[in-house]
From Swiss-Prot:
GO terms for cellular component: cytoplasm. Pathway: Purine metabolism; AMP biosynthesis via salvage pathway; AMP from ADP: step 1/1. It is an enzyme of class 2 (transferase). Keywords: ATP-binding, Cytoplasm, Kinase, Nucleotide biosynthesis, Nucleotide-binding, Transferase. Monomer. This is Adenylate kinase. Belongs to the adenylate kinase family. Residues 126-142 are annotated as: LID. Catalyzes the reversible transfer of the terminal phosphate group between ATP and AMP. Plays an important role in cellular energy homeostasis and in adenine nucleotide metabolism. Its main location: cytoplasm.
Length: 193
């Protein structure tokens, strides 16, 4: 099973991908984790990413796409994978489609978690309060202003990816406003398990 999770920050993509990862024993692939692993392993793409990151730059699409192309060839991804946090743009979605064609693979589905912006802000504020109550450090991007910027960026850059996948008949929209277990059940129903 090869899946992509889409949705705004705070929608529950990480929570739901982790549940599917555990249920189906397939890796959840995070672009940030993959970049760090490629740098640590000293792969050619990792070395290129390291040079860019060390200079304070943003890693360009072709480097991120190269890391994903390498990662999905690893043995643990043979039976499938869940991409969380990628693709973020239509250009990246097109590049992913090209990679999969070259590898004779296809996505089984693209799950989009739909959550109202006001509910997202409330979730982030709640997460920050829970972290404080536990004595944990609040994530830098969990303050309301930073979150609003992330949400604006999502609507401008990542939301069009939904239309891209809808046009290919791969998009499965799921109401992410429900309780976690209900969202999980809706995802499984959308995937027809």
């Amino acid at each position: 099973m090869r899946l992509v999770f889409l949705g705004p920050p705070g929608a529950g993509k990480g929570t739901q991908s982790t549940r599917l990862q555990q249920k189906f024993n397939i890796p959840q692939l995070s672009t940030g984790d993959m970049l760090r692993a490629a740098v640590k392993a000293g792969t050619p793409v990792g070395l290129k990413a390291k040079a860019i990151m060390d200079a304070g730059g943003l890693v360009p699409d072709e480097v991120v796409v190269g890391i994903i192309a390498d990662r999905i060839d690893e043995p643990d991804a043979k039976e499938g994978f869940i991409l969380d946090g990628f693709p973020r743009t239509v250009k990246q979605a097109e590049a992913l489609a090209d990679i999969l064609i070259k590898k004779n693979m296809k996505l089984d589905a693209v799950i989009e978690l739909k959550v109202d912006d006001k509910a997202l802000l409330a979730r982030i504020e709640n997460r920050a309060q829970e972290s404080l109550a536990k004595g944990e450090t609040i994530r830098a991007d969990d303050n309301p202003e930073a979150f609003k910027k992330r949400l604006e960026s999502y609507h401008a850059q990542t939301a069009p990816v939904s239309a891209f996948y809808a046009g290919k008949g791969a998009l499965k929209a799921v109401d992410g406003m429900a309780p976690i277990d209900d969202v999980s059940a809706a995802i499984e129903k959308a995937l027809a398990f």
